[in-house]
């Protein structure tokens, strides 16, 4: 049973695997995120009660992320229909594509962004991520959607190949460009960190000239 010959069962198994991997990665990112660490230190939680609080908070974050992922699935399904997918024809395949796209875009970002609607709109609608993590999520999400759209180009071609069945090309394109977006997001995050470090230590274009001018004024 392969993705080409049996799209529905194969996509179902791949979705279960992808959900597990994205959940583990999302929880790890959530625990290591600076905002969570700052919040835990500000509250001054004792070590004796930290385990119970952390377990309850993990379930809370997981429930929130699953809910956001479900909303993301609905949004992806609507956009798939708007871009030409049938409303009733092959609805199961379209739904699985929507779940796949949501697991690659909405679900991982929900562990950090949560229910902060302003952050979601600022990053994905206004195209202005402000932190390294937000830049990585933005690159992953945009590249995933672009890959799914690019994969749909080969569906109407008369090649008569099994992998042209809906929604196999879109899934393959989304996953391939998600991997590319992960690399691009990593590079963008590194560049943003380097620029932030340079500005913090006063290293940047024109800095040396400004410092030399200030020293000259002081000597005069």
Residue ranges of model-derived segments:
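Non-transmembrane, juxtamembrane loop and terminal tail segments
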Residues: 40-52, 197-220
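Canonical alpha-helical transmembrane segments
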Residues: 19-38, 76-79, 110
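Structured partner-binding subdomains within large eukaryotic complex subunits
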Residues: 135-139, 157, 161-204
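Membrane-lumen (extracellular) interface motif
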Residues: 1-15, 31-35, 75-98, 115, ...
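Membrane-helix interface/capping segments
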Residues: 30-53, 118-121
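Cytoplasm-facing ends of alpha-helical transmembrane segments in multi-pass membrane proteins
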Residues: 26-34, 91, 100-120, 139-141, ...
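Membrane-helix boundary/interface segments in integral membrane proteins
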Residues: 115-132
């Amino acid at each position: 049973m392969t993705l080409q010959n049996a799209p529905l069962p194969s996509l179902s198994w791949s979705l279960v695997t992808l959900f597990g991997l994205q959940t583990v990665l999302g929880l790890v990112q959530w625990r290591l995120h600076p905002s969570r660490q700052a919040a835990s230190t500000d509250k001054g939680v004792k070590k004796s009660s930290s385990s119970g609080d952390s377990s309850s908070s993990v379930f809370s974050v997981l429930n929130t992320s699953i809910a956001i992922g479900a909303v993301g699935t609905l949004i992806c399904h609507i956009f798939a229909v708007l871009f030409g997918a049938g409303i009733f024809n092959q609805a199961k395949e379209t739904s699985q594509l929507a779940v796949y796209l949501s697991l690659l875009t909405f679900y991982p970002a929900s562990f950090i962004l949560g229910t902060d609607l302003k952050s979601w709109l600022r990053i994905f609608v206004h195209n202005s991520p402000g932190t390294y993590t937000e830049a990585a999520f933005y690159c992953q999400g945009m590249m995933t959607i672009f890959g799914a759209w690019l994969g749909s180009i080969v569906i109407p071609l008369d090649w008569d190949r099994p992998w042209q069945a809906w929604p196999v090309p879109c899934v393959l394109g989304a996953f391939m460009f998600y991997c590319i977006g992960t690399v691009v997001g990593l590079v963008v995050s590194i560049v943003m960190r380097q620029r932030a470090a340079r500005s913090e230590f006063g290293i940047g274009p024109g800095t040396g000239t400004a410092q030399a001018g200030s020293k000259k004024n002081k000597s005069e």
